[in-house]
Structure formats: C-alpha cells, structure tokens
C-alpha cells in the first residue's frame, strides 16, 4: 500500500513454514515492512506481536497511524507515526477464525463516516468498528445483500462506497447504507484475487491463485506468470 504522506510503500512479509510451506528465507514470523518510495530503501520493519500472526491488509488513519489486520488472531494492530513497534488496537471474539484455523480478519478500510470496516476471509463476514478519538467502540456485524465468498482486500472509493475482491473470483463494488451492505459484482472469473487498488477509473487487481499455494496436491502448480489486471471501475 502506498502511503504518500509518509513517502512509504507498506507491505506484509509472512513466513508460512508453520503450515509446511517454505519461505524465501529462514527468518520466521510475520512483519510489516516500510520502503522509501523514492529509493526503495527499507525504513521500517515491525514484527507482529504474539505467536499466531499473519500480516494481511492495512489502511492509514487520519493521524498517519497504520492499522493492520492479523489473520491468525482476532486482532487489528496499530503502528503509530514514528514508531517501529506494532500494538494491539482492538482484539475481539467477533473476529475469531473458524475452528479449522482458516484465515480470519482480512480487508480493512476507513469509510467516509470515519469508522473502520473489515471483512473476514473464511467466514465471509463484514463488520463496522465505530471509531472516536482514535479509539475503537461498538462492533457491528453488517448484512451483505448476498453471501460473500472469501472476501479479501478492501479499499475506499469515497463516502460509504468501497471496492473489494473475493477469493471466489470477483471484484465488487460495496455500498454501505446503515447496517446493510449492497454487493455489486464488477467483474468475475479472476484467478483467486487477493487485493485491489483504485487508480483513476481503473481497478488494479492481483491474482493470488491461493489454492495452488495452500492446496498444491489438489490444485497443482500455479499458472505463470502471476498477473495484475486492470478492470474499468464503472464496468
């Protein structure tokens, strides 16, 4: 995620060795990394606290704090401006993973109302977290117009409208009206989309092909090369 104000590119770096999947290095754990947008130099490396960690999605708040979802614990973490240590901003049983341990909290974005919106990957839930003076308040489980299939990356497009990808293969327009959420599919048939970034009138969607990573014996090798595809926002 690009943070223009801080001049940083924020990314997650995760180790999947606990799931039997070797990573590119021997460094264990899950980290939030910040790189200088101009030089590419690493500026921040913050390890997620705890034993069950999977850095997933992130959003910048009005004060420059970074809010990060942990998919292996019911936690939203916060990195304050100038800090290199993540703290637990909110932990709540509403965000618990399924019993089989599939990923929980995933996409995260602020709405035009100043509140925080998150989705959960395996359970397919969509929540609003009331925010006042930088602190979390009431958590409300919202009502999507149709079931969500592996909701993932979430980004605001202004007001109470968002774009979201579903691991089931679609990128959607998400409109929040009170406790109701209207889901409109913009494009489907995408190979396991994991994230979306709106740039102008184009949505850039990454194809993650996650079944080929986590269910390699069943799904076989991924189809190379991995792609980032452009989707017209108003399609």
Residue ranges and their predicted role:
Residues 3, 9-27, 66-72, 116-122, ...:
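Conserved beta-strand positions in repeat-built beta-propeller and related beta-rich domains
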Residues 197-235:
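Blade-level signature of beta-propeller repeat domains, shared across WD40, Kelch, NHL, RCC1
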Residues 36-41, 80-84, 130-135, 175-180, ...:
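Short loop/turn segments that connect beta-strands within beta-propeller blades
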Residues 23-65, 69:
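Asp-box/WD-like beta-propeller blade repeats and closely related beta-sheet repeat scaffolds
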Residues 17-20, 32, 74-77, 124-127, ...:
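Structural signal for beta-propeller blades
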Residues 1-17, 48-67, 94-116, 144-161, ...:
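Beta-rich, blade/repeat-based domains predominating
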Residues 118-123, 143-179:
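Loop/turn-rich, solvent-exposed surfaces of beta-rich toroidal or solenoidal domains
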Residues 41-48, 85-100, 135-146, 181-186:
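A short beta-strand motif characteristic of beta-propeller blades
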């Amino acid at each position: 995620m690009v943070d223009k104000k801080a001049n940083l590119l924020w990314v997650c770096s995760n180790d999947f060795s606990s799931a039997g999947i070797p990573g590119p290095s021997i460094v264990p754990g899950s980290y939030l990394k910040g790189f200088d947008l101009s030089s590419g130099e690493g500026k921040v490396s913050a390890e997620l606290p705890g034993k069950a960690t999977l850095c997933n999605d992130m959003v910048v708040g009005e004060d420059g704090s970074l809010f990060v979802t942990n998919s292996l614990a019911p936690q939203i973490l916060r990195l304050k401006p100038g800090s290199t240590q993540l703290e637990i901003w909110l932990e709540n049983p509403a965000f618990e993973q399924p019993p089989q341990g599939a990923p929980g909290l995933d996409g995260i974005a602020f709405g035009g109302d100043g509140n925080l919106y998150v989705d959960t990957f395996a359970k397919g839930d969509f929540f609003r977290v009331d925010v006042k003076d930088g602190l979390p308040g009431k958590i409300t489980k919202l009502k999507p117009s149709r079931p969500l299939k592996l909701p993932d990356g979430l980004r605001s497009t202004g007001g109470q409208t968002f774009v979201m990808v579903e691991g089931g293969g679609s990128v959607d327009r998400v409109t929040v009206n009170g406790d109701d959420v209207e889901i409109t599919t913009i494009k489907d048939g995408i190979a396991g989309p994991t994230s979306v970034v709106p740039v102008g009138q184009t949505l850039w969607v990454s194809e993650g092909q996650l079944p080929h990573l986590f269910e390699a014996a069943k799904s076989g090798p991924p189809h190379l090369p991995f792609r980032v595809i452009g989707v017209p926002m108003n399609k």
